[in-house]
Amino acid sequence: MPAKKNTAEKKISKPVKKDIPQLYSPLLKTYFSDLTSANMIYTKIVRSPITKGRIKSLTLEDIPEGYFLFTAADFGEENYVETLDIQTEILASSEIYYKGQPIALLAGPVFTDLLDLEKNIKMEFEKDPASKIKEKEYPYAQRFIRNGKAQKPEEFTKLFSKKNYDIKGTWTSVLNAPSCNEANGAFCTFDKNILTISTPTQWPKHLQENIKRIFNLKTEEVFIRKTISSGPHTNTIWQNTVIAVMASLVAIKTGKTAQLVLSREEHFEYLIKKSPISIKIRSAVKKDGIIEAVQVLIELDSGYHNPFAAEILDRLVIAANNIYSVRNIEIIAKAYESYTPPVSFNIECIDSQAFFAIENQMQKICNVTGFLPDELRMKNFERKFSLPFTFTNEKVREAFSAIEKMYDVNRKFISYRMESKNRKIDIKNLHNFPLRGIGVACGFNGIGYFGSNIFACNQKMEATLESDGTLEIHALQPSASTLEVWKNTAAQILEIDPKQIKLNSIFDVNEDLSVPENVYANVSVMTYLLKKCCQDIQSKRFRKPLPITSTKGFTSAQKKVWNKEKFSGSPFFLSSFGTVVLELEINPYTYKIYIKNVKAVLNAGKIGIPKIAENSVKLSIQHALTELVVDENLHCDQISVSFVQSDNDPTQIDGLISRILPAAFTSALSQATGHEINTIPVKPQHFFKEMISNENSVYSK
């Protein structure tokens, strides 16, 4: 969606009137599964038991009164949800593409009866053999980058000559954090031709447009009440619409209130489960530590018909070389379809697996060449030649300098490296002192991605200074801490009391809310736009009569810094940067991992409330630690967080730790064990076997 004009002035404010049909209304602090009605019926999704094939027949005989079975035929020709120009069947009409694909809906007043009825459904399928990947020679999405003097394959090969270090690594990661959120679903009523949907939607416009088309309803006949969201994953953004459409069909066809709640297993398997990504990196490193060339191969199993596959792949490519200046870069990235559910990614750290790979590769280069972590990184930062991607990396050197001065990283790194090199692990003769390691990792968090229509900074912020001196902010409901930042920001610019500022989170059908909530809710972007609104109002308030309304969005000039066709330039509106140092010990008898300390230095612009920001980062660190080892919840009592002083606009802190801490952990673990740990989450039995085998040393190429 093209950005609208950056400024807008209106003489009359836009209060939400009761007679204006509403597209979106927040139902705060309410879970949809807590809603109930006297004539409510439950809905259960019937899923395919086969992986690949066709439905020959699907019948249920002797359906009790008050119970219903719905199939694809009940949707007619509109049996699909459209997302980013990709059509996904709501219920399989014939072809089956993955095990668990929805094929029917059961509805009735007693949920346990639905479980019994499901067992009585007679299903006949024509099965086909299903390979793991559908067609590997035809990727579902792909991206190829080659930058530098070496433009031909043979020229690239020459860079990996004997005079340079030729260092290869394969890094695999997938962190599926346990979800404590409500399982997804919807609560729908259809009364007097008005469809009301209560659901944890994160993309109300997407839901509304699909509902209108599928059921032939007018805009004013669809009312969406947003309940508490279930997490910022790509599948929860668009598949919530699929689920809400299913519940809506039941409500419309039966005339009863319909509730559809996924089971905890369904919510994980089909909405939030992520897929492992293996990234292969080959680095040509000169004797002076300069990385002359890097080759990266990213292969992603995106599942069946994933509308976000290209988006995910592009973000991985952008992060694949981190902030480093390498003269010759080749990145090949491919996403393949498979006979599995569409893969989901966490929007807040969509590129974390790329950072895990490149930062572990940097640590491996340190191990092989003997350079120190900060020394190697600074040798390959801000070199003067053209790169495909540019980032706002102010004060990166200051961050590394602060880490070394404050935490004595280099001395510990050298000491632990000597211990590791000289240690010979013998299962019959364990040492009586802990195995120690220290890991360093860095990375950025790009805010406001210009690379696609849906994540292309299409956000808008509207603020109105009313006649009575109060300020109304028209935006989606943010977190309590973010709202406090907004009020303080606006109050300071307009010189009013924060108590005079109120939030309006109701959007009527005539207002455009075309991008997902996760995009609108980006704290840094929306705070920036609010600041611009307030500055605009302040410049006019003594020359124009109140009320004054200002609407701000991103200008075309701001978006032109990224060339979408050439896939080059500055991909983000803002970037935050962070460095993490993690120190650990391993008990030589129990092989239990003890996190001694975690140190983080972050550059996130001007920090409004430092204590809140510090506590937020500490919570992020503790949360990230719980995901690193299978069946273990690591924690740390010694966490230190520092912020680089800056007067720039504040940038995003959330998601930064989850991008860089995993690599710091595996780097430290590799040093402690003396063996390369290239997969996360870590299985304790895996590194135990590695250690006693005395193979796969971190000091080999």
What residue ranges belong to the model's regions?
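Divalent-cation
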Residues: 403
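Cofactor-binding beta-sheet edge motifs in enzyme active sites
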Residues: 2-398, 414-701
